[in-house]
C-alpha cells in the first residue's frame, strides 16, 4: 500500500506532492485528512476545493484490495466535522461476490466508525453504481449529499437516484450514521466480546432488528470494530464483518494478521450474520477463532 502511495505522489503535480507527502507518508497516517490540513493544501496548491479532492483520489485508491478484478477505485467523503476520509474497493478470493465492498461504502463506513454522524459530500473516480446510490440513500444526510466526479459538475445524490426508495417509505425516520446509542449489555467478561457489544450499540438495523457488531483482534493487539449497516433495499446492507475489515484496510494493516473475532447479535433479530462471517473469515485465514454471543 505504501508503494502505491509513493507511486501516486510521483504522478501528482509537484506542488501537491511536496505538501502532501509529509501527511500521507507519516507513520501515523490514518487515511484521513483534517479540515486544517485540507485548507493548507488548498493554499499551497492553488487548487479549488473540487480540484483538490479529485487530485486526492489516487491516494484513496492506493488502499484498494482488489485481487479479483485488479480494478482500483478510490472514494473520499467529507464528514460533518470537515475531515476527509479515504475509502477504496475491497474483494476477497474464494468468497461469493456479494461480500465485496465498494469504495463509496468503504469511505462512508470509515467515517462512521471514526465517529462521524453524517457526510456532506463524496468524491469518486467513477459514477456510482446503483448499489452504492441506494446505500447512500440510507444516510442521515442523504437529502443534502453531494457527489463529485472528475471533470463533472457536482450533483446531488437524488440527481443520480431520482424518485428514490428509502427508509421513509418503510416508516423509518432515523438514517445510517445518525447519532444513536442502543443499550445492549453482555455479561461475558471477554474484552473482545465487549468491544463487539460497543459496535453493536451504534449499529443500524431497523428492518430486521438484527442490531449487531463485531470486533477483530490483530496479532499486534490492535482491535478493529464493525457495526451492521442495514439498508431499506436489503441487498446493499453492509455486514459488520465488512465494516470492521474496512477499518483494517484503511489502517494499513493486513487481513492475514487477524488473530481472533467476536460477533454479537440481537437475539430478537430476524436474520444472522454468523454463517457468512465464518465463511468469509475462513477464506482469509481458516485458523481465526470466532466467538459468538446473542444478547
Swiss-Prot record:
Keywords: Hydrolase, Metal-binding, Zinc. Pfam families: dCMP_cyt_deam_1 (PF00383), dCMP_cyt_deam_2 (PF08211). Its EC number is 3.5.4.5. GO terms for cellular component: cytosol. Binds 1 zinc ion. Zn(2+) binds at residues 102, 129, 132. The active site is at residue 104. Gene3D superfamilies: Cytidine Deaminase, domain 2 (3.40.140.10). GO terms for biological process: cytidine deamination. Its cofactor is Zn(2+). Substrate binds at residues 89-91. Belongs to the cytidine and deoxycytidylate deaminase family. HAMAP family: Cyt_deam. Homodimer. This is Cytidine deaminase. It comes from Vibrio campbellii (strain ATCC BAA-1116). The lineage of its organism: Bacteria, Pseudomonadati, Pseudomonadota, Gammaproteobacteria, Vibrionales.
